[in-house]
């Protein structure tokens, strides 16, 4: 079962997601409220809405950053290439009709390297296009046990626009990519063992491979003393190796979220926000 603390940790990266400008404090801290409507899993027709107080944390160090929809450590950087350690996660799924009689899905935590290649960057750094190649190991845990559930690879194109649509201070991020998952990952989310098979839910297993596509748009603005932002994401599992799983009830999912945070403290040291 997901505790409030766990949910807050999952939403930290969203609340700190798009705080970008030319010069910003080394760190910022505050508190806010976030709301998001999230499917139980990709391909599920059941959604959960989370409305929770969340911490607002941003750190823009040379080696470790908490921003840009993720917590990541930078191990290597040139003008064209960065090598990061990225983290991600997803909430649990319980009381799902398609999985009735099957074990609930625990929250997952993802971590692994990401190779980021800058394809274009305007001279004023207000427009950036990059290819991101993250490969993350996935574990599931209810904090009483830990289960390894495979790997996920999500190559994507990411476009960041500062002062979007000629509106000063508004930052827009657009991302589109593919999803690939291994056999263990697909077994965790989409397999039906014979013991759980029913007349309406036949046994199913899938190997690893193509797992669909995703498109994300996020917008935010930092005002004096507070921050606002929102996002919308579309996912498709059309053509995925697990598309025919009886646990897949829809081929398309939409995820939306919104957050507002009040910034109570900030570093006097200013640094350039490179993302």
Residue ranges of model-derived segments:
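Transmembrane beta-barrel domains of Gram-negative outer membranes and organellar outer membranes
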Residues: 32-121, 134, 191-192, 196-205, ...
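Residues that define the transmembrane beta-barrel architecture of outer-membrane proteins
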Residues: 27, 47-53, 79, 105-111, ...
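Sequence/structural signature of outer-membrane beta-barrel proteins
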Residues: 36-42, 90-96, 118-122, 136-144, ...
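Outer-membrane beta-barrel transmembrane domain signature
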Residues: 146-227, 235-242, 247
């Amino acid at each position: 079962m997901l505790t409030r603390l766990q949910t807050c940790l999952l939403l930290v990266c969203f609340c700190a997601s798009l705080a970008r400008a030319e010069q910003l404090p080394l760190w910022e801290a505050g508190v806010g409220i976030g709301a998001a409507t999230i499917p139980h899993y990709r391909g599920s027709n059941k959604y959960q809405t989370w409305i929770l107080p969340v911490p607002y944390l941003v750190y823009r160090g040379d080696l470790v950053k908490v921003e840009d929809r993720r917590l990541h450590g930078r191990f290597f950087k040139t003008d064209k290439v960065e090598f990061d350690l990225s983290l991600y996660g997803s909430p649990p799924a319980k009381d799902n009709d398609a999985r009735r009689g099957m074990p609930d899905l625990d929250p997952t935590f993802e971590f692994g390297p990401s190779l980021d290649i800058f394809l274009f960057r305007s001279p004023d750094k207000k427009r950036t296009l990059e290819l991101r190649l993250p490969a993350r190991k996935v574990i599931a845990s209810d904090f009483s046990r830990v289960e390894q559930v495979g790997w996920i690879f999500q190559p994507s194109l990411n476009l960041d626009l500062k002062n979007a649509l000629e509106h000063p201070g508004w930052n827009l991020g657009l991302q589109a990519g593919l999803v690939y998952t291994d056999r263990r990952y697909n077994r965790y989310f989409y397999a039906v063992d014979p013991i759980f098979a029913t007349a309406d839910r036949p046994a199913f297993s899938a190997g690893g491979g193509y797992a669909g596509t995703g498109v994300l748009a996020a917008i935010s603005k930092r005002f004096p003393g507070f921050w606002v932002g929102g996002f919308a994401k579309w996912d498709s599992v059309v053509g995925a190796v697990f598309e025919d799983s009886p646990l897949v009830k829809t081929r398309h999912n939409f995820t939306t979220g919104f957050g507002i945070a009040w910034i109570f403290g900030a570093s006097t040291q200013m640094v350039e926000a490179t993302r």
